[in-house]
């Protein structure tokens, strides 16, 4: 019988193993060892290594998106929502470096994963930004000539580059809160109305 606890244990172990070894170098036996389960147990829950990676994205990133939406929705001001989004995004690199490493490295290397997730989870995540921009435009806070699709990618790109820097650095070179504020302020200066 499948156990939700064992499933979660395997996912957590996979995040660590994929971050340490990379998806292509990791083996099912590495994940089983890290999860303290038999190799065969993995196959009760997942068809193969790629299935585990997909589950990591579905479950772990799904949780992160839900948390981000919840935090953003607690704010009234579109400007504050942008700041909250930036801080939550950058905080992931500090709070869950292994997951941040997987997002930074594996999402870019696996063409199959990119095809599947560019259209779903990734879009859902960056669409939070475009929804904030549209809300600000409706309230005449943000310029009407700003295209939300372009702006969301520019903002995400700045955050993504800082996350990549932190993932590749042994020690974060900048303070996360200060960086989130600085990126948010630069972005908001570009899209604020009048």
Where are these regions (language model features)?
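Amphipathic alpha-helical packing segments from all-alpha helical-bundle domains
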Residues: 62-69, 113-139, 149-153, 178
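C-terminal peripheral helix-coil segments that are non-catalytic and often amphipathic
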Residues: 84, 88-91, 127, 131-139, ...
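Hydrophobic alpha-helical connector segments
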Residues: 55, 70-95, 148-155, 177
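Short, hydrophobic secondary-structure boundary micro-motifs
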Residues: 101-103, 116, 144-145, 175
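Basic, helix-initiating cap at the start of DNA-binding domains
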Residues: 1-21, 26-34, 51
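Alpha-helical DNA-contacting segments of helix-turn-helix folds
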Residues: 53-60
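Short hydrophobic/aromatic patch on the recognition helix
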Residues: 36-46
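Amphipathic alpha-helical segments used for helix-helix packing
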Residues: 93-113, 164-168
């Amino acid at each position: 019988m499948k156990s939700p606890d064992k499933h979660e244990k395997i996912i957590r172990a996979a995040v660590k193993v994929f971050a340490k070894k990379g998806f292509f170098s990791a083996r099912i036996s590495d994940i089983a060892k890290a999860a303290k389960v038999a190799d065969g147990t993995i196959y009760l829950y997942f068809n193969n290594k790629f299935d585990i990676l997909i589950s990591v994205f579905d479950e772990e990133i799904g949780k992160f998106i839900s948390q981000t939406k919840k935090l953003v929705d607690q704010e009234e001001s579109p400007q504050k929502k942008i700041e909250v989004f930036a801080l939550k995004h950058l905080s992931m690199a500090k709070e869950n470096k292994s997951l941040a490493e997987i997002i930074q490295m594996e999402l870019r290397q696996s063409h199959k994963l990119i095809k599947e997730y560019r259209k779903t989870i990734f879009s859902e995540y960056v669409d939070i930004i475009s929804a904030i921009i549209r809300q600000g435009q409706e309230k005449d806070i943000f310029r009407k000539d700003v295209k939300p699709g372009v702006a969301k990618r520019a903002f995400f790109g700045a955050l993504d580059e800082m996350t990549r820097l932190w993932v590749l650095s042994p020690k974060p070179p900048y303070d996360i809160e200060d960086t989130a504020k600085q990126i948010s302020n630069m972005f908001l200066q570009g899209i604020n109305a009048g």
